[in-house]
Amino acid sequence: MIVPVRCFTCGKVIGNKWDTYLELLQADYAEGDALDALGLVRYCCRRMLMTHVDLIEKLLNYNTMEKSDPN
């Protein structure tokens, strides 16, 4: 959903690298090369960006305050 601000394992700040990571992928960098360019060398930090799924835009389409009609 929302990009984690810190790595769950080591605590390094990674939230500010998400947009740059996406830009590098759009520029035809390989995932590993993009992470190297960002300075992410630990496996735990690399995992945080590689496995993140950005679902926030899809979830904003649902209205949680809307009541469904039981009939």
UniProtKB/Swiss-Prot annotation:
Pfam families (alphabetical): RNA_pol_N (PF01194)
Metal-binding as UniProt keyword: yes
Intracellular or extracellular location(s): Nucleus
Keywords: DNA-directed RNA polymerase, Metal-binding, Nucleus, Transcription, Zinc
Binding residues annotated for Zn(2+), in chain numbering: 7, 10, 44-45
Gene3D superfamilies, per the entry: Homeodomain-like (1.10.10.60)
GO molecular function annotation: DNA binding; DNA-directed RNA polymerase activity; zinc ion binding
Primary site of residence: nucleus
Superkingdom, natural source: Eukaryota
GO cellular component, one term: RNA polymerase II, core complex
Protein name: DNA-directed RNA polymerase subunit 10-like protein
Species this chain originates from: Arabidopsis thaliana
